Amino acid sequence: MSSAIETKKVVVEEITSKLKESKSTIIVDYRGLNVAEVTELRKQLREANVEFKVYKNTMTRRAVEQAELDGLNDFLTGPNAIAFSTEDVVAPAKVLNEFAKKHEALEIKAGVIEGKVSTVEEVKALAELPSREGLLSMLLSVLQAPVRNLALATKAVAEQKEEQGA
């Protein structure tokens, strides 16, 4: 076999493993973005621990078939870039959605969220969710509210008894 075919097989395996290992994968059309904008997008994604790569559609299609992600091939037309995140489900959706709001040339096409092919609407809905840390802080404040109310009520009763005793 030629070395070109071997190289392509390695790339397909790489894409397949990233599709399977990532918690969140988003496909975007980057047509119309200039070099400075793409560089800025890559920087923002890197800061969020998201890998952003451009692959040939034919190789991506083969990887999608190997990863058994039916329905994703429909979105693999034109120039595409793929954002992979193995840590945070929300991070790539959030960064790409914010960037797409500022730069209309970036178009979110589809995504794979925890192994399930997702539409643009689902990706955008995911982007609107708070981060894991934000959700945890909300949960913590909800859990602390009854304790705080009990402490305030106890303090009020103590002050009331103090006034009656004085």
UniProtKB/Swiss-Prot annotation:
Keyword Amino-acid biosynthesis: no
Organism: Bacillus licheniformis (strain ATCC 14580 / DSM 13 / JCM 2505 / CCUG 7422 / NBRC 12200 / NCIMB 9375 / NCTC 10341 / NRRL NRS-1264 / Gibson 46)
UniProt keyword list: Ribonucleoprotein, Ribosomal protein, RNA-binding, rRNA-binding
UniProt-recorded Gene Ontology molecular function terms: large ribosomal subunit rRNA binding; structural constituent of ribosome
Gene it is expressed from: rplJ
Protein name from the UniProt record: Large ribosomal subunit protein uL10
Coiled coil: none
A GO biological process held by the record: translation
Keyword rRNA-binding: yes
GO cellular component: large ribosomal subunit
